[in-house]
Structure formats: structure tokens, C-alpha cells
Amino acid sequence: VTCFCRRRGCASRERHIGYCRFGNTIYRLCCRR
């Protein structure tokens, strides 16, 4: 499983499973299988 923290929406093959925070910026945690 490969996960990314993305500022915009997840790719079509990825699932949005949570959030990442870096300072004041919130990213979406997207995982691809």
C-alpha cells in the first residue's frame, strides 16, 4: 500500500483515509493499493 499526503483531492485510484497536518496546512492522506 502506498500513501501520499495531498493538498488537493485524491486520485481516482486512491482512497481518502485520513488527514496529515504540517503546521497550519491540512493535507488529505490518500492510499493506493
Curated annotation (Swiss-Prot):
Matches recorded under SMART domains: DEFSN
Alphabetic keyword roster: Antibiotic, Antimicrobial, Defensin, Disulfide bond, Fungicide, Secreted
Domain of life: Eukaryota
Main location group: secreted
SUPFAM superfamilies, per database record: Defensin-like
Coiled coil location: none
A Pfam family per the record: Defensin_1
Disulfide bonds listed in the record: 3-31, 5-20, 10-30
Function noted in UniProt: Anti-fungal and bactericidal activity, greater against Gram-positive bacteria.
Family of this protein: Belongs to the alpha-defensin family.
Protein name per UniProt: Neutrophil defensin 1
Organism: Mesocricetus auratus
